[in-house]
Amino acid sequence: MSKFIVYVKKSSEFATIPTRSSKKSAGYDLYSAYDYLVRPKSRVLVKTDICLSIPDECYGRIASRSGLSLNNSIDIGGGVIDGDYRGVIGVIFINNGNSPHYIKRGDRIAQIVFERLANVEIKEISNLDCTCRGDCGFGSSGI
């Protein structure tokens, strides 16, 4: 199995290179480059001050850290990092709780999971094939 190489550039002295907690961790932790106050029921764009060069066959998906979600009611807003994006990685940090959340420089705020890109072709058709499930969604297959 060949390894893909993701190149990382720090855009400031406050940036931290992403790390994995263990060899089997799917995601690489992302770190805040600055201090932030995230008020209850609000969101903040948290800068990491890193830029990435992701291989053409991949993209990066920003995901929440389970402990922040469970213990602090923190969510991460949609985050897909395309392979051709070269700007600073920012994380949409959402506080769904009733208390302010303080982020300190160097805190782990999210994780990035590198996934293989499916190269598909989109074709318009007038009818789709039938399935047992049909158009039933949102819990129709069981909870």
UniProtKB/Swiss-Prot annotation:
It catalyses: dUTP + H2O = dUMP + diphosphate + H(+). InterPro entries: dUTPase, dUTPase-like, dUTPase-like_sf, dUTPase_trimeric. It comes from the Viruses. GO terms for biological process: dUMP biosynthetic process; dUTP catabolic process. GO terms for molecular function: dUTP diphosphatase activity; magnesium ion binding. Its EC number is 3.6.1.23. Pfam families: dUTPase (PF00692). Its cofactor is Mg(2+). Keywords: Hydrolase, Magnesium, Metal-binding, Nucleotide metabolism. NCBIfam families: dut, PRK00601.1. This enzyme is involved in nucleotide metabolism: it produces dUMP, the immediate precursor of thymidine nucleotides and it decreases the intracellular concentration of dUTP so that uracil cannot be incorporated into DNA. Belongs to the dUTPase family. This is Deoxyuridine 5'-triphosphate nucleotidohydrolase. The gene is DUT.
